[in-house]
């Protein structure tokens, strides 16, 4: 199976949402055509924007509309799963528009592959990403040894958020990996609805900048390998 990988640079959220929808509809129209084309993977950087999933809670937005406008950020209530998150400069946003039927997988397995690809991406930087039971995305934590020798996991912080939509086995929306994201934007929300967990980035964990271009290229390789896809030339 083949996939088209597109780097579209910096694009406003609404414009990219419409672009996703166009690709989504085109892929739906081609279902059952017998081709080896499995879809498109978009890599994009958005200007500052908050998005709330279809079942999200507006109370997780901690600032009002006036403050939002003063900061120069946008807000959209959208049709993906998950709660509230932020997209902005230095963040690798990835939207796989894929036909899961052609890939022979279901939605749960699809999300597992997204998570695994992120875990492998941050591992390239020596970062131990992991899953958190009851939550999607990829997380980091610190393992602390107590005086009695017991080891506990503390300081859970999210490095990648995942929120997707699927209809008739075709996906849209996707993931947001914090490469060099300004994390102050997350202080204005309860990220993904959590009030007891933090947010981090590759840059913060390493103490050196890892930019969008570098991290997105690593992620692309991991996605292609884990979905067993070849990139269309």
Predicted regions and their residues:
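N-terminal lobe of the biotin/lipoate ligase/transferase fold
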Residues: 1-156, 209-210
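Long, positively charged amphipathic alpha-helical accessory segments at protein N-termini or as interdomain linkers
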Residues: 2-8, 111-159, 164-233
């Amino acid at each position: 199976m083949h996939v088209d990988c597109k780097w579209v640079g910096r694009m406003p959220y609404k414009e990219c949402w419409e672009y996703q929808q166009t690709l989504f509809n085109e892929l739906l129209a081609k279902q059952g055509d017998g081709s080896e084309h499995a879809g498109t993977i978009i890599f994009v950087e958005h200007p500052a924007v908050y998005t709330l999933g279809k079942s999200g809670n507006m109370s997780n937005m901690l600032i009002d509309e006036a403050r939002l406008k003063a900061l120069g950020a946008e807000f959209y209530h959208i049709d993906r799963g998950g709660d509230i998150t932020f997209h902005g400069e230095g963040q690798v946003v990835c939207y796989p528009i894929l036909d899961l039927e052609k890939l022979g997988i279901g939605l749960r397995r699809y999300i597992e592959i997204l998570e695994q690809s992120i875990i492998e991406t941050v591992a390239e930087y020596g970062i131990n990403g992991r899953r958190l039971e009851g939550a999607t995305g990829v997380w980091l934590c610190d393992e602390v040894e107590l005086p009695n020798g017991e080891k506990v996991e503390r300081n859970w912080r999210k490095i990648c958020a995942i929120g997707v939509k699927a209809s008739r086995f075709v996906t849209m929306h996707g993931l947001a990996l914090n490469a060099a994201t300004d994390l102050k934007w997350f202080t204005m929300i309860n990220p993904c609805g959590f009030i007891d967990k933090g947010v981090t980035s590759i840059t913060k964990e390493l103490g050196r900048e890892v930019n969008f271009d570098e991290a997105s290229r690593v992620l692309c390789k991991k996605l292609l390998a884990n979905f067993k896809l070849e990139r269309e030339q």
